[in-house]
Design a protein with these regions (language model features):
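Alpha-helical repeat scaffolds
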Residues: 89-97, 125-133, 159-171, 197-208, ...
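Residue at a conserved register position within TPR or TPR-like alpha-solenoid repeats
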Residues: 45, 79, 117, 153, ...
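Short coil turns that delineate tetratricopeptide repeat
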Residues: 66, 100, 104, 138-140, ...
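Structural register within alpha-helical repeat arrays
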Residues: 41, 75, 113, 149, ...
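N-terminal signal-anchor transmembrane alpha helix of single-pass membrane proteins
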Residues: 1-30
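Structural motif corresponding to the intra-repeat A-B loop/turn of tetratricopeptide repeats
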Residues: 48, 82, 120, 156, ...
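TPR alpha-solenoid repeat register
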Residues: 71, 105, 109, 142-145, ...
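Alpha-helical segment of the N-proximal tetratricopeptide repeat
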Residues: 31-67, 74, 80-90, 94, ...
Length: 386
């Protein structure tokens, strides 16, 4: 009830202004007085949770006085927020049916009706009304409608038409190019899943990079294709390019790079050189641990010394876990020490199990897997490794 009162405040304010204005401008009009009484009656129905009667009352007023359109739109939003979608739809449908609506008012009503159907999950109907807004106008209402269409197409995975609509937005918002790049990546991934011609896949990935040069996802897929074709040099070049695209995703390149360097003539020496160079530029725990793994293959003591220095500069649970492993690998580690270290290792592991691996920089959504589209805030490329 308290929430309803807060939602009604702007409507009540608008209604109060409208009533005062109509009385001031035409105090002799019995029709205006009747509208005023009906408005108060409608608000009373709302406050008493009699929504159907409220809708009937407001529709009746609309038939008499077109000046109440803005308030009717606000009421529609109120019903939608309360989850009373059917009543919001009815109110907006009656608005659209009015023959003397101003152009902007009709666009608002069409957009509102599209949003009603979108919230109700009736995406086909929502799409129809959003297109009607776009066909009529190129204003802010049309821009909002296009964004809703993109949400629909993303849910339905209709990537070709999503690209077409997103290009319309690019006229006034260059940030949409990031979305377009991901749509091409989605198409490329679909082709890969059907074992299609890889040339077509590469073409789509190149288009993705054309729209967004920082599209890490496109290069991750390209790198995987190069590995599958055993083109190790090419794969290394692709994965190393990700460091410049977005260093936050360096972690995602370490395992495939290790695979590539094992087959490359420079071997682990080449990989170690690259990792040290990258660590000097970007102090990331994943890089330190990758270096430790390579050093440990030849000298456990040096690996222990290196990791200790890294942890002093940047403590982390994965680093501490690896440090315990290095101590366990020491030749002079006693049985008692091993028992204590294994207990500590188990505790660290439990702490790590409760920690997310990825987090959305936009909304804070935590995840154990890398989603390119955040399921919470619906933004692309905002989920990154921690």
């Amino acid at each position: 009830m308290l929430e309803l009162l807060f939602l009604l405040l702007p409507i009540a304010a608008a209604s109060g202004w409208y009533i005062a204005y109509s009385q001031f401008s035409n105090s002799s009009s019995s029709k205006k007085h009747e509208c005023n009484r009906e408005y108060l009656r409608g608000l009373n129905y709302l406050l008493n949770e009699q929504s159907d009667k409220a809708v009937d009352t407001f529709i009746k007023i609309l038939e008499v006085d077109i000046e109440t359109v803005e308030t009717h739109l606000a009421l529609g939003v109120l019903f939608r927020r309360r989850g009373e979608i059917d009543r919001a739809i009815r109110l907006h449908q009656n608005l659209i049916a009015r023959p003397n609506l101003a152009h902007a008012q009709k666009l608002q009503a069409l957009l509102a009706l599209g949003r009603d159907y979108y919230c109700a999950g009736l995406l086909d109907r929502a799409e129809r009304f959003f297109f009607e807004v776009i066909d009529h106008d190129d204003s802010e209402y049309a821009r909002i409608a296009v964004r809703y269409l993109l949400e629909i197409y993303q849910q339905q995975k209709r990537w070709e038409i999503a690209i077409k609509q997103a290009k319309k937005i690019s006229k006034w918002d260059s940030k949409i190019f990031k979305n377009i790049a991901h749509y091409h990546c989605e198409l490329a991934q679909n082709l890969l899943n059907t074992q299609a011609n890889q040339k077509e896949v590469i073409k789509l990935l190149e288009l993705a990079l054309k729209y967004d040069a920082h599209c890490v996802r496109a290069n991750l897929i390209k790198g995987k294709l190069a590995i599958n074709a055993e083109k190790w040099e090419e794969a290394i070049t692709i994965y190393q390019a990700i460091k410049k695209q977005d260093p936050d995703y360096i972690t995602e390149t370490l395992e495939p790079l290790n695979q590539c360097y094992l087959q490359h003539q420079s071997g682990s020496i080449g990989l170690l050189s690259y990792l040290h160079e990258t660590l000097a530029e970007h102090a990331q725990t994943s890089l330190s641990l990758a270096i430790v793994k390579l050093i440990q293959e030849k000298d456990n003591d040096k690996a222990l010394q290196f990791l200790t220095q890294q942890l002093q500069a940047k403590p982390s649970l994965p680093g501490l876990y690896q440090l315990v492993d290095l101590h366990l690998a020491q030749e002079n580690c006693s049985l008692t020490d091993k028992s204590n270290l294994n207990s500590l290792k188990g505790l660290i592991q439990k702490l790590m199990e409760n920690k997310p691996i990825y987090r959305c920089l936009s909304c804070g959504f935590n995840s154990k897997i890398l989603d390119w589209l955040c399921p919470a805030c619906r933004n692309w490329s905002t989920i990154k490794p921690l």
